[in-house]
Regions:
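Secondary-structure boundary elements
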Residues: 1-30
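Hydrophobic/aromatic-rich core segments of domains that either
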Residues: 44-105
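TPR-adjacent "capping" and linker segments in tetratricopeptide-repeat scaffold/adaptor proteins
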Residues: 93, 99-106, 113-142
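TPR repeat positional signature
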Residues: 143, 176-179
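Hydrophobic/aromatic side-chain positions at a characteristic register within alpha-helices
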Residues: 151, 167-170
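Alpha-helical linker/edge segments of TPR/alpha-solenoid repeat scaffolds
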Residues: 183-196
Length: 196
């Protein structure tokens, strides 16, 4: 079996057996317990399998989304975990179009700090982030995503705790910025000083 065929089987079997129900802001624990996943947890599962089978790949973080680029026999392929059908993009023109949708003339453009990373339908017209991350940093993004849920529910202490965990795994401006904002809002909204 060639590498492309094996990759296709990995992608298909992962969706059949693990990635069962797309649910925005699902955790990796949710994925393992019930099959609920989002782009972060789905990409993490695929990344672990790609590691196991020796594929060369990179996880790409954008403002609202995470996906995987696989490098195979001199070509770049896309694994889009949120699309069980059509999510393995192999045609060079389709790969270029997919990547181009996240870039504006080669550079990303600005976004809101309290937006999540779990969407399937993403407006990419004003992206600012297009960054390669490793699996540890992806785990940090998982904590960030969970923190956004708490932030949007004005549960700032829980958001700050998750953002602190995220920063250990992935020190980034967006995580630090949301943590600072959560601390400020906890103080201004509830009069609680939660500096750590």
């Amino acid at each position: 079996m060639d590498s492309l065929s094996l990759l296709r089987i990995i992608f298909q079997k992962t969706h059949q057996r693990l990635l069962k129900d797309y649910t925005q802001h699902s955790s990796f624990s949710d994925l393992l317990e019930s099959g609920a996943y989002d782009c972060v947890s789905g990409s993490a599962a695929l990344g672990l399998l790609l590691d196991r089978y020796g594929y060369s790949y990179e996880v790409v973080e954008t403002d609202y989304h995470v996906f995987i680029q696989v490098y195979l026999e001199g070509k770049t392929l896309i694994l889009e975990s949120t699309l069980p059908v059509g999510g393995m993009i192999t045609a060079p023109s389709a790969v270029s179009g997919y990547l181009g949708a996240y870039l504006n003339e080669g550079k990303p453009v600005a976004r809101n700090i309290n937006e999540g990373l779990a969407g399937t339908k993403v407006d990419t017209s004003d992206n600012t982030i297009f960054r390669k991350v490793n699996l540890s940093e992806l785990a940090g993004l998982q904590h960030y995503n969970e923190a956004i849920v708490h932030f949007n529910q004005q549960e700032y202490r829980q958001a700050i705790d998750l953002l602190s965990k995220a920063l250990v795994l992935y020190p980034s401006e967006r995580i630090e910025g949301l943590k600072d904002l959560s601390i400020d809002l906890a103080y201004h909204t509830y009069g609680v000083d939660i500096r750590k």
